[in-house]
Amino acid sequence: MQKIHSFIALSLSSVFMAAASVAHAQNIAAGKEKATALCAACHGADGVTVIDPSYPKLAGQYPDYLARALQDYQSGARKNAIMMGFAATLTKEDIANVSAYYASLPSPLKVKK
């Protein structure tokens, strides 16, 4: 009986993990679409800006950091007129998707040895 319960629990967790992976892939695709439309002009198509070195490099950043930054622009906790305007147009889902997309990209930042 214990083996059956363990098997069922393992099977269900596998199903949920597979579903989460599929949803994650969709989030990244949606995030790329939104980022291309709103963010790429300043932050670069690959999340590494070539326009102005003071613009943050977004590629490879932690998704929770990116999401928090966008939420802070929406709430006014972070101040930048351009970013506040763009962030105001984003839904919670958009923020999660864009954050997942940029986090999925390779980081250009390297530690010097």
Which sequence ranges carry the predicted segments?
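N-terminal signal peptide c-region/cleavage motif recognized by signal peptidases
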Residues: 18-20
